[in-house]
A protein has these predicted regions:
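Class I S-adenosyl-L-methionine
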Residues: 1-66, 70, 181-195, 203-294
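A broad, low-specificity signal for short, low-complexity segments enriched in glycine/proline
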Residues: 8-9, 24-29, 138-142, 154-161, ...
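Class I S-adenosyl-L-methionine-dependent methyltransferase module
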Residues: 63-174
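Short loop/turn segments at strand-loop or loop-helix junctions that form parts
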Residues: 131-132, 199-202
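Mobile active-site "lid"/loop adjacent to the S-adenosyl-L-methionine
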Residues: 140-155, 201-219
Length: 294
């Protein structure tokens, strides 16, 4: 495996796009353009099977793409953005408009929306929760998938600001379609000349948060190997050096599966900050690895 310079040391053909639609754990919006700079120039269809906040897809703005996620309400948000952006605006407006001008009932509104979601999981409630919860950490209990994240300390963005973001994003993702799929089913659709970008839920601490879905890294490596055998290029973002207390997590990829490795400096760990109750994290620095099969 060859080691490339850090993403910050190379020219960036993909311009930055810093406008977030969703607040979501693991969001790579700040440096998504640097990740996309390592994508091939001749991509057929772009696949992103762990869509999350859609930061990389939105930044890359593929001519043709499939964005998918195992969390159905999240997939509903993206599908609605694609086929009816005005409805997405209405989802947010209907909930945000319940908040008083002085924000005195902000937490009450949030808890009401959260209760509605837990009673019947849906994209409309999840959209507001993602913009309003603490740190963008949409946390689920593994036992019953109950969404348990508390209300954030920040003020949810105004309806007008959110609507502008929807307009910007709907234009950037117009080449993509969105679906509720297991990552394996999505990756099996990729063909020679296509590109799959994977940003799976982090193991260790984050695995218990993201949609409460079970995830085995070895299974993903096996699917990547099958993609590579068909001529599909795969780019994988994964923990390179993540400090959780005194523990340092380093994953070793199967020999020969990846041909290029890039270290990405992601700054402070948002997840760890949430767990430490807002404490500053001078030693909690995350360095992702970007692994490429090409």
């Amino acid at each position: 495996m060859t080691s490339a310079p850090t993403l910050f040391d190379v020219p960036q053909p993909v311009p930055p796009f810093k406008t977030q639609l969703l607040k979501w754990i693991g969001n790579k919006q700040r440096f998504a353009h640097e990740i996309a700079s390592y994508f091939p120039d001749d991509v057929g269809t772009y696949f992103e099977p762990f869509l999350g906040s859609g930061a990389v897809l939105g930044t890359y703005a593929p001519r043709k793409g499939l964005g998918s996620d195992a969390l159905k309400p999240l997939s509903e948000i993206w599908a609605t953005l694609s086929h009816d952006a005005e409805e997405l605006k209405q989802w947010y407006s209907a909930r945000r408009s319940l908040v008083d001008a002085d924000f005195s009932n902000k937490e009450e509104v949030y808890e009401k929306v959260k209760a509605s979601y837990n009673n019947s999981p849906n994209g409309a409630d999840l959209l507001y929760i993602s913009r309003s919860c603490y740190g963008g950490v949409v946390r689920f209990r593994q036992a019953d998938h109950f969404l348990s994240t508390p209300c954030g300390v920040h003020k949810p963005i105004p309806v007008e600001s959110f609507n502008r973001r929807v307009d910007i994003w709907s234009e950037r993702v117009k080449g993509a379609v969105f679906a509720h799929l297991d990552y394996r089913d999505a990756m099996q659709e990729a063909r020679k000349g296509d590109l799959v970008y994977c940003d799976p839920p982090y193991t260790d601490t984050q695995a218990i948060l993201y949609g409460a879905q079970k995830f085995v890294l070895g299974d993903l490596f096996a699917e990547i190997e099958r993609c590579k055998s068909r001529g599909v290029r795969v780019a994988l973002s994964i923990d390179g050096t993540k400090k959780s207390g005194l523990k340092e997590i380093i994953h070793a990829a199967p020999e020969g599966l990846f041909e290029t490795e890039v270290m990405v400096n992601c700054g402070r760990s948002m997840l760890r900050r949430f767990q430490m109750g807002g404490a500053t994290l001078e030693s909690e620095v995350v360095a992702d690895r970007l692994l490429l099969t090409y």
